[in-house]
Design a protein with these regions (language model features):
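Phosphate-handling DNA/RNA-contact segment within nucleic-acid enzymes
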Residues: 64-159
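Basic, glycine-enriched DNA-binding surface that flanks or lies within the catalytic cores of DNA
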Residues: 14-103, 108
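Single conserved hydrophobic/aromatic residue that forms the stacking wall/gate
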Residues: 1-8, 12-13
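Acidic active-site catalytic centers that drive phospho-/nucleotidyl reactions
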Residues: 8, 121, 125, 171, ...
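Hydrophobic (often cysteine-bearing) scaffold residues that line and stabilize catalytic clefts
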Residues: 3, 32-36, 179
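Residue-level signal for well-ordered alpha-helical scaffold segments within enzymatic catalytic domains
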Residues: 5, 38-42, 128-131
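An exposure/low-complexity boundary signal
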Residues: 10, 14-30, 142-148, 155-157
Length: 223
């Protein structure tokens, strides 16, 4: 259907037919994960066993076309419903994109057996936090919103009824602080809500700084 109207003194013609939403599909996987493994472990400082855990679970892989890191989110049946792509190069501007057709409720996450849910903006921050605080990490639940939407948080709370505590680990900047306040206002009626703030802008910054400090101490001890 074509609609014709006036905008100011100009004629506006537009097609009102909405295009159907593109069905969700995971990007084709590369034959190996060498570039993504190297990027996450060497450049981002994430623990090898943490990267390996999510890779073995099929929740993290390298795409074939551009060698991006792909973080997969599944529904309660384990069916992939969401994918977040992130460039795996250590130079230039970072590329981040949720794959078209992704269901925002099912972003990258991990379901544990405990009662606490840790909430992050980005998958790399989630993996960085686990690296920083690895003790019994698999007991807890984690979700990376791939942004600041509360939808993935609400979905995790709905599908994991034992959860009663939410720890908001969003970035230490204006957007992260505002989103944390919004989430806390919405959630604190039913849940215990805490704000965990990274010392730097985000948890990966904290991780890389701690690694650099540890290397500096080691060098001083060798002198």
């Amino acid at each position: 259907e074509i609609l014709i109207g006036l905008v100011g003194s100009e004629m506006c013609i537009r097609d009102s037919t909405e295009k159907p939403a593109k069905p969700f599909a995971l990007p084709p996987a590369n034959k190996d994960m060498r570039r993504v493994f190297a990027y996450l472990i060497k450049h981002r400082g994430i623990a090898r066993d943490v990267v390996a855990h999510f890779a073995k679970a099929g929740l993290l892989y390298e795409d074939a076309e551009y060698h991006n890191a792909v973080f997969v989110g599944t529904d309660v049946e384990g069916v992939p419903r969401h994918a977040h792509k992130r460039s795996a190069n250590s130079y230039g501007k970072a590329f981040r994109l949720n794959v078209e057709g992704s269901d925002p409720r099912y972003s990258f996450h991990y379901v544990g057996t405990g009662r606490s849910l840790y909430v992050f903006e980005a998958p790399i921050d989630m993996l960085s936090f686990i690296t920083l605080y690895p003790e019994n990490w698999q007991r807890h639940s984690y979700v990376a919103c791939c942004g600041t939407s509360i939808q993935p948080v609400l979905q995790m709370l709905e599908q994991t009824p034992q959860l009663d505590t939410v720890l908001l680990c969003l970035d230490n900047d204006e957007a992260g602080n505002q989103a944390s306040r919004r989430m806390q206002n919405q959630l604190e009626v039913r849940y215990s809500v805490e704000r965990l703030i990274p010392e730097s802008k985000d948890w990966n910054d904290d991780l890389t700084l701690s690694s650099e400090n540890a290397q500096g101490l080691a060098m001083n001890e060798m002198r």
